[in-house]
């Protein structure tokens, strides 16, 4: 789901999402990170 991390590129979300979900699968959606 969405996490409270601002972004411009999906790769900016990989590390934050890995910390939250343990998975590096992420997308930047409407300038906010979404983890899968």
UniProtKB/Swiss-Prot annotation:
Main location: secreted
The organism's place on the tree of life at top rank: Eukaryota
Positions marked as site (Basic residue of the functional dyad): 27
Keyword Ribosomal protein in record: no
Disulphide bridges: 7-28, 13-33, 17-35
The keyword Lyase is annotated on this UniProt entry: no
Site (Aromatic residue of the functional dyad): 36
Record-given protein name: Potassium channel toxin alpha-KTx 16.9
Organism: Buthus paris (Scorpion)
